[in-house]
Every structure is written in C-alpha cells, then in structure tokens.
A protein has these predicted regions:
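C-terminal non-catalytic interaction/assembly regions of soluble proteins
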Residues: 67, 80-162
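Accessory alpha-helical/coil subdomains and C-terminal extensions
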Residues: 1-75, 81-83
Length: 162
C-alpha cells in the first residue's frame, strides 16, 4: 500500500517511472537517449543517397543487384525471406558485386515483424528494421559518407542488449 497513491495496490519492484505528490510528477530516473537513436546533420543536404530495395524470392535473378548498382544505387536493401535470407545463387552474385564495388548491402526481412541477426557475411544486418526503414537509415548513413563499419554500428544500435 502507498500513502500518496490513488492506486494503493501495486508492485513495488523497479519499472515505475515515478509518482505524483499534490499533482506534481516526480521521476525516479533522468530522461535517457532511446536505443538506436543516431543524429544525422542534414542542414546542408538537398538529396539523399540512392538506395534500392530488392525483394528476395526463390529463383531471384542474380543480376538484379548488379543492375541496380549500374543504374546508380549507392546501397542495396535485400527484403529477404524469413530472417533476411536470399537464394544461394543471388547471394553469390551479390557477394561478388560487393567484393568488386564495396557497395553496402543490408539484409532485412519482408515479414510484418521479426529480427535479422548479425553475422550474415558481407551484408549488414537490419536488426528490427523492415526494408523501408532500413532504406532510410542506409540513405542517411551514405549521405553522411559513413564507411561500412560505421554503417554496421548504426544498424547495430537497434539490436537488443545481450
């Protein structure tokens, strides 16, 4: 029970944000920066980098990634099956393209919800980001001229804490 709370029966474990006394809120913790928050200064930017989304499927044409890069894509998002999977033939072609050009490629999931874990080789894992959100994040990172490791770090900010 609590002497100052209208809801007298509650759990006393951590998790509450604070309490009210005389209609004034008192917080237990200072505001925290949200997980995954990255600041991009776009003050002098008029255009974002071109990033294309390729929807993966069985028998995906392996030349799609090469055609996207040839038409000006500076980064690619693979909207993969399950947790970001693409066919082995398309993966081999994308890997060869990455080795030849260094164009960043992000593995995402096309399902409504889910997570793409890190450790998928040459691609950057999108974590919880769907293809549309991953595209915007990659556009921002490329516009700020982030390198591959910086891009990996930006996406890793959305991963759950281990």
């Amino acid at each position: 029970m609590h002497a100052n709370s209208l809801d007298t029966f509650y759990s006393t474990e951590a998790g509450q944000l604070g309490f009210y006394i005389n209609q004034v809120p008192y917080f237990y913790y200072e505001p925290a920066k949200p997980i995954g928050a990255t600041y991009f200064n776009l003050a002098n930017t008029t255009d974002l980098a071109q990033v294309d989304i390729l929807y993966a499927h069985q028998d995906m044409a392996p030349e799609l990634a090469q055609l996207a890069v040839a038409s000006g894509a500076q980064g690619l998002i693979f909207a993969g099956m399950g947790a970001g999977g693409i066919s082995s033939v398309a993966r081999e072609a994308a890997s060869a393209l990455f080795n030849a050009t260094g164009v960043p490629m992000v593995s995402s999931h096309r399902s409504a919800d889910g997570f793409v874990p890190s450790g998928s080789g040459f691609t950057v894992a999108s974590g919880f980001y769907n293809p549309q959100k991953a595209r915007v994040l990659l556009q921002l990172a490329l516009t700020m001229e982030y390198g591959l490791e910086q891009i990996r770090e930006v996406f890793a900010l959305s991963y759950p804490m281990a």
